[in-house]
Swiss-Prot record:
InterPro entries: C2_dom, C2_domain_sf, CCD33. Residues 602-617, 907-920, 949-958 have a biased composition (Polar residues). The keyword tRNA processing does not apply. Residues 632-774, 859-899 form a coiled coil. This is Coiled-coil domain-containing protein 33. Residues 602-628, 899-958 are annotated as: Disordered. Keywords: Coiled coil. It comes from Homo sapiens (Human). The keyword Coiled coil applies. Residues 214-353 form the C2 domain. It holds the Pfam family C2. Signal peptide: none annotated. GO terms for cellular component: peroxisome.
Amino acid sequence: MAFRGPEPWVSASLLRQRLKAEEKTLDLEFEVLSVGFNEAGRYALRLSAENPLQVGSGAGVQLQVNDGDPFPACSAITDVIEQQEPGQSLTLTRSKFIFTLPKGFCKNDGQHDAQLHVEALRLDEPLGRAAQRVGEAIFPIYPRPDQPRMNPKAQDHEDLYRYCGNLALLRASTDPTARHCGSLAYSVAFHVHRGPQPPVSDSPPRAGQPELMSPEEPLIASQSTEPEIGHLSPSKKETIMVTLHGATNLPACKDGSEPWPYVVVKSTSEEKNNQSSKAVTSVTSEPTRAPIWGDTVNVEIQAEDAGQEDVILKVVDNRKKQELLSYKIPIKYLRVFHPYHFELVKPTESGKADEATAKTQLYATVVRKSSFIPRYIGCNHMALEIFLRGVNEPLANNPNPIVVIARVVPNYKEFKVSQANRDLASVGLPITPLSFPIPSMMNFDVPRVSQNGCPQLSKPGGPPEQPLWNQSFLFQGRDGATSFSEDTALVLEYYSSTSMKGSQPWTLNQPLGISVLPLKSRLYQKMLTGKGLDGLHVERLPIMDTSLKTINDEAPTVALSFQLLSSERPENFLTPNNSKALPTLDPKILDKKLRTIQESWSKDTVSSTMDLSTSTPREAEEEPLVPEMSHDTEMNNYRRAMQKMAEDILSLRRQASILEGENRILRSRLAQQEEEEGQGKASEAQNTVSMKQKLLLSELDMKKLRDRVQHLQNELIRKNDREKELLLLYQAQQPQAALLKQYQGKLQKMKALEETVRHQEKVIEKMERVLEDRLQDRSKPPPLNRQQGKPYTGFPMLSASGLPLGSMGENLPVELYSVLLAENAKLRTELDKNRHQQAPIILQQQALPDLLSGTSDKFNLLAKLEHAQSRILSLESQLEDSARRWGREKQDLATRLQEQEKGFRHPSNSIIIEQPSALTHSMDLKQPSELEPLLPSSDSKLNKPLSPQKETANSQQT
């Protein structure tokens, strides 16, 4: 199955928006359902989560095999299967692998290609040789190919994809004709990390007498008896932690049948009150007299009752509910936090402990825990905590789980000599035989200084391909664990768990390997300089003197962490999570120290063996099984303590001399630095002056810029004010424009009136012509006179003086004729004047809005406008009066014409009486010529002839 790119039906941007895989922690569940190979042999599969486009992509990946605990690893190996018939499908025990991929492992940006690399390893090579890689397959994790499709909209509780399929294992060969070497069937699921789910039980474990429990009930009870991470008991209480390893030569049941044993641990108060205990181990898988349990149970008691309480261990048969053995250990004899590895021996009723049938042993480790760590005089720290994580690389030749024995030895050289001499106290796990009834409390005594340390046993680490322990060891300051010196070291011994089976479970065979971590003073100083916890983390501590090999044919390494505890009640013990936050020890320093240890290991062992070969071997044979506290032993212990003190004093002197040399070097460096600082002060002063000048110039520039900005702001404000004034002026001109339109309408009306006046003038002219014709007709003489040769005219005949004659030839009144002529001339002149002034008046009105340049001009124009309005009103009234007068005159003229036509003649005196009014009227008609020029909106020909109106107009103009 080759990867062909991201899903074609979902764009990369949309997929990134929906899924956002780079921001989430994802789980890949890959289960191998079956596997088959085309050739017979022993095979194993190695599964690795990797990103070939990124270097170190496996960092941060967590792995969980089957239902085990997760541990940091990006690859795992299945159990070994033997292919006898080619092509046959086989199943695996370690078949389910859950890879927890950290944030950023899966991305869809073209730079990441998360995949699962499956390799087929052939293990037919001799033991110790590297496995041969014969086949491989690639499973794309993310991005996915188009088939089967992934669900990018999946919620946290849903799977991105889940299906079953087959993978072909292609041969890992350069031959192009090579084909696949086998295939495997798998089931895969990919989803967001959900964390560990708590186990769901149908019913809680029953609390009752152990004799009434079924075989399954002790199994349920043992699940709640896992050891806690902390080493302290609850407040005002003490905890007795008992690890039941196994037993040999258990007695048979009363009916002679093989027992089906399990162990119940309780206190004497619980036994007295007939209380059931929850500290129950599991039941063996089959009836046996040599059971192996490996379970740890805890019993809590009140701290004030520790002097009167005993811990009781009962071996019970599950079928018969029969008590097989019972042991009672006084708690007051146990030293706090010291691990006791007991071989509990109980003789038969005959009391013959030397008989073979009487040797019934129960192997257990007992630790008494308090709510605080006791402080000892002369110790700066309470304890040293060691957290052992596991093997870093998968192993190729380890078939069984591994147990670890950890100890802190004060003198590593002497410890190597003891191991070379096969000293029982330095090899394996020292056993303390404890027979019952207990003969003396000295069996629980612990020496003040132990050359071999206080060894502690771990639980079996699995799986065999890559053991993982995640176990913490606590070493007290009383044992010398916190006194870092040149010879102190942490020693880890690795044993196969199969060496604990059989009739003698504590007869450990040759160790699989050993790891040594020197606890020197420099390491102590480095621990105290860290932040947070006073500890360090060692990533790769090698396993020396071992036949174990990794799948890369290299020596295996383990990861561990350690810290110093300075408080009686520490709050934080080391865990798999917080141990990662500790500072990592420099691998170069560690390799340098370990190289010296590796080189000196064989030399010291050989030399110590040759030196001690000349001594009599009787000393080893004469050592009793039970330790004796004799005077010579005490003297030897004191001598060793004095020797250690002398060595410490010498080491302190060496350190003091080294520190003095370092101080001299530091003083010289300080003096040199002061000289350099004195020389650099001048340059610094110059730099300061130049910087001040630059700062001053920059401040001046800033000031200019501020002034410029202020000026521009003022200009902007003025512009805004000018804009507001123009807007207000425009708003003020709107009503003036309306008034102007109104005035223009009035002018049009005046024009209409002018047209009417012109029409009246034409009518008057016609009437004058008709009147002249009539007058001429009337002025004709009678026919008699015609015969005399006098011509006839329509108008009166003119006399010698130029005046018209009457009908009878007499002269007409001079005043009447002059009045008519004057009125006619006046009307004609006024009409001509209006025609000449009409055009400039209109142009001047149209140009008025352009002259509004200021406030004072505006007020002047408004005043003139008011004056023009009043003038227009006066002219309109004059026009109306003139029209009425002209109408009356017209009517009078028409009446006279009719009277003349009818032959009515007015007496001469009547005409003379009217002459003054006519003269007055003629004088009034001459007055408009003396008026000033009118405004553009006025009409000059419509002025009234009355003198009061003239005075009013003159006063308004001034």
